[in-house]
UniProtKB/Swiss-Prot annotation:
Location in the cell: Secreted
Highest rank taxon of the organism: Eukaryota
Official protein name in the record: Snake venom serine protease KN3
Domain Peptidase S1: 25-248
Length: 257
């Protein structure tokens, strides 16, 4: 049975196609403290996810990362020794592509969060650009997060880890995830030989290609980083109109079909 690495800490969700478990960055190295000013730690009720600051008031993450009493931490590198410019916010509003966040469909695992008040840009806090065009196959992209660094054990690092992976042919993911539609609004990315991957706790974090957020960590295999088992990312480019409409104040905007 295919396991979905719905990358939130032991967060088990019922999907419309299959049930799977979550994961984090495996096979990477500690990120440079200055290379992730847009990276957000999203947490609630003992669960953690990643997120991406796209402007001073808005964050992108995965729909399955939603929960009560959510907090978002900005300007964070070490969780135990925070930067002086760290900031914490809570959601003011949340927007989803689905009527229920508990039933995640391929390509609709996306949540747009409006913060209770804007963050202040600083040395370790700055937004990441939205995509100007979709990434092509074989593009080398970056993944990052505070997720577990072991494919089989829950070993959560104090600092975020980063790794480079590549955009793969959609058919590679369809071979492992039979419910994935040919034209779903997702990206397939990973390393075919295995060894580098997102893992538990990395859900909602960014897939960064050419300095832009192209994907949101959604689904993967269990255990993480297995050969020929890439992960699935919600494709941000296909949701640009929805994202921009919501931010502009059109809260009734609908997601692409």
């Amino acid at each position: 049975m295919v396991l979905i690495r719905v990358l939130a800490n032991l967060l088990i969700l019922q999907l419309s196609y299959a049930q799977k478990s979550s994961k984090l960055v495996v096979g990477g190295d500690e990120c440079n403290i200055n290379e992730h000013p847009f990276l957000v730690l999203v947490y609630h009720d003992g669960y953690q996810c990643g997120g991406t600051l796209i402007n001073e008031e808005w964050v992108l993450t995965a729909a399955h990362c939603d929960g009560k009493k959510m907090k978002l931490r900005f300007g964070l590198h070490s969780k135990n020794v925070p930067n002086k410019d760290k900031q914490t916010r809570v959601p003011k509003e949340k927007f989803f592509c689905l009527s229920s966040k508990y039933f995640i469909k391929w390509g609709k695992d996306i949540m747009l969060i409006r913060l209770n008040r804007p963050v202040n840009n600083s040395t370790h806090i700055a937004p990441l650009s939205l995509p100007s065009s979709p990434p092509s196959q074989n593009t080398v992209c970056n993944i990052m997060g505070w997720g577990t660094i072991s494919p089989t054990k829950e070993i959560y690092p104090d600092v975020p880890h980063c790794a480079n992976i590549s955009i793969l042919d959609h058919a590679v993911c369809r071979a492992f995830y039979p419910g994935l539609l040919e034209k779903s609004k997702t990206l397939c990315a990973g390393i075919l030989e295995g060894g580098k991957d997102i893992c538990q706790g990395d859900s909602g974090g960014p897939l960064i290609c050419n300095g832009q957020i192209q994907g949101i960590v959604s689904v993967g295999g269990n255990p993480c980083a297995e050969p020929r088992v890439p992960a699935i990312y919600t494709k941000v480019f296909d949701h640009l109109d929805w994202i921009k409409s919501i931010i502009a104040g059109n809260t009734a905007a609908t997601c692409p079909l």
